[in-house]
Design a protein with these regions (language model features):
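Short acidic/histidine-rich active-site segments
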Residues: 194-208
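His/Asp/Glu-enriched short active-site or ligand-binding loop at hydrolase and phosphoryl-transfer sites
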Residues: 162-174
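Catalytic phosphate/metal-binding cores of nucleic-acid and nucleotide-processing enzymes, i.e., regions
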Residues: 1-2, 9, 13-17, 29, ...
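Generic structural signal for hydrophobic
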Residues: 39-46, 130, 157
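Extended substrate/RNA-proximal surfaces in nucleic-acid metabolism proteins
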Residues: 2-15, 59-163
């Protein structure tokens, strides 16, 4: 876990703003339009320093496409109390036993996956399993969460072991509504709780 934590901690705001790093990408293994292989090739062609393919609830893309430059990642659907959220896991051991119960049973992580509506994933158990698998746990696009108090919401997750928060995210592009928090307020919360700041385009298209 420490290697990936230090690597991602070293990524700067400038890296994200210049498009040199993209830690939130989806392929056809979930609801993206591009193949896993095409995304890897595009990332290389664009000269990305680091990139992660983070399909919903599945690592099948990483299993079937080993030995690429992509950081292993997943975007999990999970509940915390009354709040439905997405947790990004980075740098996980693909063979870790504790993680297996959290993956979708469907090969494509979003296809006919009832868990996306009535998720049985528990945020505390998931974060613990991510750490057991050598990974780091990051709250995705927090401004989309129905949290009346974002500070308390994040504090709860930090007490469970949350490592980071997705600060750099194209809300106008992908999310029609920002719920109760602004992107600027999220960065302040990240600083308050000493969280790793990550970011990505949440790409679902054929082109990065």
């Amino acid at each position: 876990m420490e290697n990936y934590k230090e690597l991602i901690k070293g990524i700067t705001r400038e890296d994200f703003e210049k498009g040199l790093v993209n830690l939130h990408i989806h392929s056809r293994y979930s609801d993206g339009k591009a193949t896993f292989k095409d995304l890897v090739e595009q990332a290389k062609a664009k000269g990305l320093k680091y990139f992660a393919i983070t399909d919903h609830n599945t690592i099948q893309g990483h299993i079937e496409n080993p030995n690429t430059d992509a950081i292993s990642g997943v975007e999990f659907d999970v509940w915390h109390k009354y709040i439905f959220l997405h947790l990004l896991a980075y740098g996980i051991d693909l063979n870790n036993e504790k993680m297996k119960k959290f993956y979708s049973k469907d090969k494509r992580g979003t296809e006919a996956d009832i868990v996306r509506i009535f998720s049985q994933r528990n945020s505390k158990e998931l974060i613990e399993a991510i750490h057991d698998a050598g990974g780091i746990a990051v709250l995705a696009h927090p401004c989309c969460c129905w949290a009346l108090s974002m500070d308390k919401f994040v504090k709860d997750l930090v007490e469970m072991g949350l490592d980071g928060i997705e600060v750099f995210y194209p809300y106008p592009r992908w999310r029609k509504y920002i719920k109760f928090s602004s992107p600027d307020s999220i960065e302040k919360i990240a600083d308050k709780y000493h969280l790793i700041k990550t970011g990505g385009t949440d790409c679902h298209e054929e082109k990065l």
